[in-house]
Amino acid sequence: MTQSQHSQSAREALAERIVEAKTRKNLTFEQINEGTGLSVAFTTAALLGQHPLPADAARVVAAKLDLDDDAQRLLQTIPVRGSIPGGVPTDPTIYRFYEIVQVYGSTLKALIHEQFGDGIVSAINFKLDIKKVDDPEGGSRAVITLDGKYLPTKPF
């Protein structure tokens, strides 16, 4: 039976255990994800408390991280989503995404509405991909793809 959380505390505590096990075992999220049949972005979000994992995927990651049966079951529960507490984020990496939305949010909204009409881009029917590529000017660039289904507003 599908279970749902009523607060973030249990999944937050499990996320701490997962990060500790990942560090202790010197694993990457990609290595933990292998064999789940899911994207590394989805599995990582689940391990950090933002999605439930299917039973088979929960078994795979629990075995790799030496998590007990209770933790494996908790990974399958529907979490209370949203990992950033109220206010402006203070972590520099997360803040940059906040800054991107502050600078480009109205542009994204205008272009989405111009191309698709009145509606939203789903964060539920959604895919995320991150790639590291060489910058021709030196260093590296992060190519981040946000792929969400467009959902039109329906008059009623």
UniProtKB/Swiss-Prot annotation:
InterPro entries: Cyanase, Cyanate_lyase_C, Cyanate_lyase_C_sf, CYNS_N, Lambda_DNA-bd_dom_sf. Its EC number is 4.2.1.104. GO terms for biological process: cyanate metabolic process. The keyword Lyase applies. Keywords: Lyase. Disulfide bonds: none annotated. It is an enzyme of class 4 (lyase). The active site is at 96, 99, 122. Belongs to the cyanase family. Catalyzes the reaction of cyanate with bicarbonate to produce ammonia and carbon dioxide. This is Cyanate hydratase. It comes from Burkholderia pseudomallei (strain K96243).
